[in-house]
């Protein structure tokens, strides 16, 4: 059991998965350490990796606080997500019930509802995002936690969390901070796992399918070549040595509908699937989601500003660099297959054409930085970071290759930034653009960033593709009929 840091507290959480009642779990919190007279207990409004308000406090009911004599303390709900507790210096425990956030992963959803950040509870399966179950005291997000899950012996916990003690009916975890707890989802289900051992990294694939079939072995076979190619793309330098894929598959044989959702974490990804038990369809969906989410180990998980490092779960300050966190990640996702030789130029051009076409339906007068600073208010425009953001980085990649005679592109840029900063060394949000110019030595990038990231000028796609012997006309991208030696050489550097 953790000892409270000087002047701090330790959270001790416990719950029993075997006592699920009408989709609700009862959670108990006890505290060690010195606490102030008044405390505010909150559940997140939003969590890292999503950009819309989820208000996880809406799933909490019956919250009570007791003093050391077992008498109730005054509790007042301040808003959807927060409660004030009076005379907290005498606080012994808090109890409350948690309802699950979604009943089943399927087509019934609403815009802005990020189910991969939420939870569902069934007797045989629990998809757990800690932000749904466990709250925090304002001012104490850096305090350590102990979490005890009592459970049926039939349930296996798949997670990147490390169990400090384990028995068939109980798992105990010690976590360094609230942020670290929220960064590690858990899938409790009957065991269906497969291990992938690659150079320098060990990956667990844990699955649950409502079809009742075991699918982890097949899914791991899909993921392994993807990870090998991603490692190759990154120069065989991965920032983590352990990783977990948690995959929940809902099979509805009556519906010919395919959906997937995923959310990245530092050492894991949670993927939700709604589709028939069709290995090819599952492969294509998992491949697409897993590729994007795994690249997030670089950014923002490995490279980010203070706005993400010091994340406020209820009043977040947003970074202006979604063009990097999501746009660059998506560019790596679409660039990696052709760069590693598993995709043809024609296939790559088809992917780009789709991005170009979809981008046309979004507001061209909204800059990427303006979207990034107000994503909750601009939910209808948010998806453009995966379209315009990816195509922007394509332009930047070609431009850097041209300026450096092929020696330097966005892969090298991200590598340099991570080397200088990294997971525990956040950068100053407002200084990243000048930092990029200093790192690369290319002052020409100032106009590029002013025009296309901070500004609203149309991306120079046609011009940049022409530099590598590709023609963009009427939404179609095709090889130029008579490319020059210089164009072909730059294309080889790029692809």
What are these regions, as identified by a protein language model?
Residues 1-4, 422-495:
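Beta/coil-rich, acidic/histidine-enriched accessory regions frequently appended to metallopeptidases
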Residues 2-46, 129-130:
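Early extracytoplasmic/domain-onset interaction patches
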Residues 34-65:
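N-terminal, post-signal-peptide region of Sec/Tat-exported proteins
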Residues 53-62, 66-240, 258-261:
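Non-catalytic architectural context of zinc metalloproteases
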Residues 172-180, 240-259, 326, 330-331, ...:
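Carboxylate/His-rich catalytic cores and anion/metal-binding grooves
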Residues 194-321:
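Juxtacatalytic substrate-recognition/specificity segment
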Residues 303-312, 316-389, 419:
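Acidic/His/Gly-enriched intrinsically disordered linker/tail segments
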Residues 359-432, 440-446, 454-459:
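Pan-zinc metallopeptidase signature
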């Amino acid at each position: 059991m953790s000892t409270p840091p000087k002047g701090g507290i330790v959270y001790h959480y416990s719950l029993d998965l075997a006592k699920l009642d009408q989709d609700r779990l009862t959670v108990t919190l006890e505290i060690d350490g010195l606490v102030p007279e008044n405390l505010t207990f909150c559940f997140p409004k939003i969590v890292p990796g999503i950009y819309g308000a989820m208000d996880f406090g809406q799933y909490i009911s019956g919250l009570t606080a007791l003093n050391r004599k077992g008498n109730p303390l005054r509790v007042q709900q301040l808003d959807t997500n927060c409660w004030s507790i009076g005379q907290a210096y005498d606080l012994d425990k808090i109890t409350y019930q948690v309802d699950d956030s979604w009943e089943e992963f399927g087509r019934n959803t609403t815009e802005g509802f990020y189910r991969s950040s939420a939870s569902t509870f069934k007797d045989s399966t629990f998809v757990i995002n800690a932000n749904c179950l466990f709250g925090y005291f304002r001012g104490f997000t850096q305090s350590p936690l102990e979490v005890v899950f009592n459970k049926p012996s039939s349930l296996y916990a798949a997670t990147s969390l490390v169990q400090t003690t384990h028995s068939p009916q109980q798992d105990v975890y010690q976590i360094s901070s609230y942020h670290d707890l929220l960064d590690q989802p858990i899938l409790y289900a009957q065991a269906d796992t497969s291990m992938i051992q690659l150079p320098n990294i060990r990956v667990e694939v844990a699955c649950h399918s409502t079809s009742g079939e075991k699918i982890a072995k097949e899914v791991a076979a899909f993921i392994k070549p993807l990870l090998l190619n991603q490692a190759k793309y990154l120069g065989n330098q991965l920032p983590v040595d352990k990783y977990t894929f948690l995959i929940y598959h809902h099979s509805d044989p009556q519906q010919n509908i395919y959906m997937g959702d995923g959310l990245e974490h530092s050492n894991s990804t949670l993927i939700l699937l709604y589709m028939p038990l069709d290995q090819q369809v599952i492969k294509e969906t998992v491949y697409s989601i897993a590729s994007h989410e795994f690249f997030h180990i670089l950014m923002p998980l490995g490279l980010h500003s203070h706005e993400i490092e010091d994340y406020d779960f209820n009043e977040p300050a947003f970074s202006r660099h979604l063009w990097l966190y999501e746009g660059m990640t998506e560019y790596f996702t679409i660039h990696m297959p052709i760069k590693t030789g598993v995709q043809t130029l024609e296939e790559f051009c088809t992917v780009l054409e789709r991005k170009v076409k979809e981008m046309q339906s979004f507001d061209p007068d909204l800059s990427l930085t303006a979207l990034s600073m107000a994503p909750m208010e601009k939910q209808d425009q948010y998806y453009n970071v995966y379209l315009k953001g990816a195509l922007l980085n394509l332009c930047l990649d070609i431009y850097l290759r041209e300026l450096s005679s092929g020696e330097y592109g966005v892969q090298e840029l991200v590598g340099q930034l991570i080397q200088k900063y990294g997971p525990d060394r956040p950068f100053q949000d407002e200084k990243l653009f000048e930092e990029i110019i200093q790192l690369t030595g290319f002052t020409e990038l100032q106009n590029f960033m002013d025009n296309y990231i901070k500004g609203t000028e149309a991306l120079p796609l046609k011009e940049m593709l022409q530099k590598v012997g590709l023609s963009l006309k009427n939404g179609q991208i095709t090889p130029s009929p008579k490319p020059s030696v210089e164009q072909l050489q730059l294309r080889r550097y790029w692809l």
